[in-house]
């Protein structure tokens, strides 16, 4: 996935009201841009950190740009635009780059399922039946180690999705929790038990119920993203 247009570099002044960020561009222009991330963005929003943003050509849009990338304190690039994760996964699915999920005959997005009114990010159809996928974007890395963690904030919704997937797996339906790691320099993924122990517990229970837990790491550059390789998940 290449960015639709060249990204511009700047530095972060502040993030506020969840969806807004003030930045200063490399040319000294101060802008308020859209922050497309509902998480805490731990390690992705230290004051003064380097950021990259895309500009909008839509004159009707209130904000002139969207925050796309951050440089973490460890010098890694993180894609903070969580909407990119689903697009990146779909691109990889259609290209056959996720070997464990290859061979499907149809793909649908945002499909309702479960008893808790959830929507799966993807439903794949195979000759043998359906498969449901929940995608999570991972950008959290605590230190110099090459292990990323999820979530970066307490997520009741994420735990609900795991319960729904586990229920499918118990019925004999393939269910997948897929972590799209949009952080460079990562070699493995784990649940962030120190942030949300309930989520970690739900993930382990889902895996025991038969949910397939997969993680794929992206090559993150200022030109684009590429879902490059499978990563181990340390439960």
UniProtKB/Swiss-Prot annotation:
Record InterPro entries: SfsA, SfsA_C, SfsA_N
Domain of life: Bacteria
One term of GO molecular function: DNA binding
NCBIfam families according to UniProt: sfsA
Family to which the UniProt record says this protein belongs: Belongs to the SfsA family.
HAMAP family the record matches: SfsA
Protein name: Sugar fermentation stimulation protein homolog
Gene transcribed to yield this protein: sfsA
